Amino acid sequence: MTATATMPATMTAVQFAENPFEPRPEHKFTFGLWTVGWRGRDPFGFETRPALSPVAAVQLLAEVGAYGVNFHDNDLVPIDATAAERDRIVREFRRALDDTGLKVPMATTNLFSDPVFKDGAFTSNDARVRAYALQKTMRAMDLGKEFGAEVYVFWGGREGAEVDAGRNPIDAIKRFRDALNYLCEYSIDQGYNYKFALEAKPNEPRGDLYFPTTGHYLAFIETLDHPEMVGVNPEVAHEQMSGLVFHHGVAQALEAGKLFHIDLNDQKPGRYDQDLRFGSESIKASFFLVKLLEDSGYQGMRHFDAHAYRTEDMEGVKDFARGCMRNYLIFKEKARQFNEDPEIQGLLREIAVEDPELERLCRGYSREKAQQLSQRTFDREALARHRLQYERLDQLVIDLLLGVRGR
């Protein structure tokens, strides 16, 4: 049995079953090589941790109980690697995956680090850069499929501007569409069967990015040649940077059948992209996100796109990874308690007013229904007096989250 499929050596089967906060393969927890491999460098300071090889990252993630590992092409294979070096790296990485049982559910392309992408990749004003970005992405798709990746994420970190005079944003959108249409056809032609997932962000590293929110991408997807192949990869911190309620955007993606992947982390309001440990800051928001994912039956990966504080050593990186998964499972257990709490559920039933006849009239237009509805009378004052009790409901949620429910 593999490291991810077995219970800890000191834990009995009964204890394992009784511990709802222990990660298991069915939870589908994944991390990127760049997350546990982040060395702590920031704009004001150098690295605080040693480099972590891809093989060592796989071993670390297996040790903490993750299901899988994801990567950008150059997280695994350096951009200037020779063919022989690439083959050796791939061979060693595959051996590490086989030894640990970790999966590679998602892959992506780094189109933001190298100076060639300083003014964009697919949206660059330079046709040579746009062509190179396509070539690099096709090769990265080949690499991801070698390891069985099923989802391919696109984050346009340099697809934006600081100087709006430099590029017509309509041209940028058209270029981005052309690139995705091309890559969809490449995936079809190669038999890869990828699901593409587009990841939004309002700014950083560019001053402004062309697709700032998940909603922008949901609208854009419908203009593609193969919209059925393309969904979204919302990230907690990215949407919070825009001042949005993250789980509302996730709900829209779920309702549209477009939540192909999700990036979980946390964020202080009004800050740069912090990539904090999931659930470490926004406790109520994280709870409602997990509740939404679990209640909706979301079947995809729970990917943690975050990193340990730069104060930490490698043991602290393990603490970070364990904390991400543990916090998710704590919120999952709290969601179960919410759904089974008689007082909370009773209050929700009181708040909602069901009227089958009105539902019939309001769902699915017909001239007859419109005529019947236009003749109905409503007591506005009585409707306005309906008691909602949201203060009480919200306090019950707070009590539940703080562990004092029923006291």
Can you name each region flagged by the protein language model?
Residues 2-67, 78, 91, 98, ...:
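Histidine-acidic metal/acid-base catalytic patches
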Residues 69-73, 154-156, 198-201, 232-235, ...:
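Short beta-strands and strand-loop turn motifs
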Residues 130, 134-136, 201, 233, ...:
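Functionally constrained cores in energy, signaling, and assembly domains
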Residues 144, 152-156, 170-204:
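Glycine/proline-rich, flexible active-site/cofactor-binding loop segments
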